[in-house]
């Protein structure tokens, strides 16, 4: 395998670059939660095995305009530094676990292709619609919105099949051993398989709940990314006893923090209607607070959480309006946006750039 020159970055959305002198460059743009970070790790690891150069970006909002901004900033850099990219036979933009770019606001390079790996029902743009603009530049389109798929499992399977095709079984099996178990463990949490598949074994349900605490108990998405990459470098796999022990620690520590946050949210709960409640909850605690609230208030059909710049929406499986529609309505009402899954979604209600100019009281007034 070729030797890589690798760099990690603290500023901006750029996280990681790897240069080995490959003939192809992969621009990986992913969401910043556990699923998005795992998706980026899957795409980056496949790039390494294929001996392709890569640059990884992670972004928190998952909004379409932010995907476009990241790509356009890279394109601006490329135009100013043509010698840094003209040697590539192909530059593949790999977008995972987030909205696609705004095609009317991006002018791709001649040798640029696009791949999209997502599972959010509220994000869907049909393949035929993208192909009308991109034509044969649309290289890979893997959108699966049922509970059996998340960004991690979609990128895992897509890269496994690509490695099988390009490098053969040996390379594909190495990739499988490194990332399959972890990716499917992420899926247990991210699409709420642990809660919504009754026949799931109890140990899988427990693991699913635990996985949801990982990105909440680590400093940042960049720290999570670097940690997973370091484990892969050291242990050659994420399916390792030390990793599962770390998950247990995250879960236990998170539970203690959530109990206090839940008590605070319950005291300040706003009853919107007989079936809808609004709770104040930081993103870090929102999932567990929603779970505990639903356990104690089974008649509620919708739980909305909010914090300084946005919030989340949960609806029960029998509720008539999908969560992503409610989230979109709230977000657009604040001149922002929202989306996600049928029963779990998120929204923005305060532009974080504007938030820099507001004091704490003003921020609370916005939400």
Task: Please tell me what each predicted stretch does.
Residues 198, 210-253:
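Long, charge-rich alpha-helical interaction segments
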């Amino acid at each position: 395998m070729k030797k890589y020159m690798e760099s990690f970055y603290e500023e901006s959305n750029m996280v990681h670059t790897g240069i080995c002198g490959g003939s192809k460059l992969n621009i990986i743009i992913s969401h910043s939660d556990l699923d998005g970070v795992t998706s980026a790790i899957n795409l980056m690891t496949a790039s390494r095995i294929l001996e392709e150069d890569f640059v990884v970006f992670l972004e928190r909002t998952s909004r379409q305009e932010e995907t476009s901004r990241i790509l356009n900033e890279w394109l601006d850099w490329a135009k100013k530094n043509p010698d840094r990219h003209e040697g590539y036979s192909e530059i593949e933009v790999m977008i995972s676990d987030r909205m696609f770019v705004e095609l009317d606001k991006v002018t791709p390079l001649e040798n640029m292709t696009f791949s999209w790996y997502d599972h959010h029902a509220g994000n869907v743009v049909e393949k035929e619609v993208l192909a009308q603009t991109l034509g044969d530049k649309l290289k890979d389109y893997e959108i699966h919105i049922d509970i059996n798929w998340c960004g991690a499992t979609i990128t895992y399977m897509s890269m496994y099949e690509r490695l099988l095709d390009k490098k053969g079984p040996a390379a594909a099996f190495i990739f499988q051993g490194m990332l399959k178990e972890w990716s499917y463990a992420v899926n247990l949490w991210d699409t709420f398989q642990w809660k919504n598949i009754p026949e799931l074994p109890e140990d899988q349900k427990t693991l699913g709940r635990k996985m949801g605490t990982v990105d909440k108990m680590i400093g940042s998405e960049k720290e999570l990314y670097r940690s997973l990459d370091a484990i892969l470098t050291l242990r050659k796999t994420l399916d390792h006893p030390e990793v599962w022990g770390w998950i247990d620690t995250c879960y236990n520590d998170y539970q203690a923090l959530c109990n206090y946050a839940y008590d605070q949210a319950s005291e300040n709960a706003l009853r919107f209607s007989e079936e809808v409640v609004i709770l104040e909850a930081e993103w870090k605690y929102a999932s567990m607070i929603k779970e505990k609230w639903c356990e104690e208030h089974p008649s509620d059909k919708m739980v909305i959480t909010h914090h300084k710049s946005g919030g989340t929406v949960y609806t029960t499986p029998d509720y008539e309006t999908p969560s992503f529609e409610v989230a979109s309505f709230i977000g657009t009402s604040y001149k922002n946006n929202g989306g996600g899954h049928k029963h779990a979604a998120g929204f923005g209600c305060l532009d974080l750039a504007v938030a820099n100019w507001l004091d704490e009281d003003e921020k609370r007034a916005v939400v």
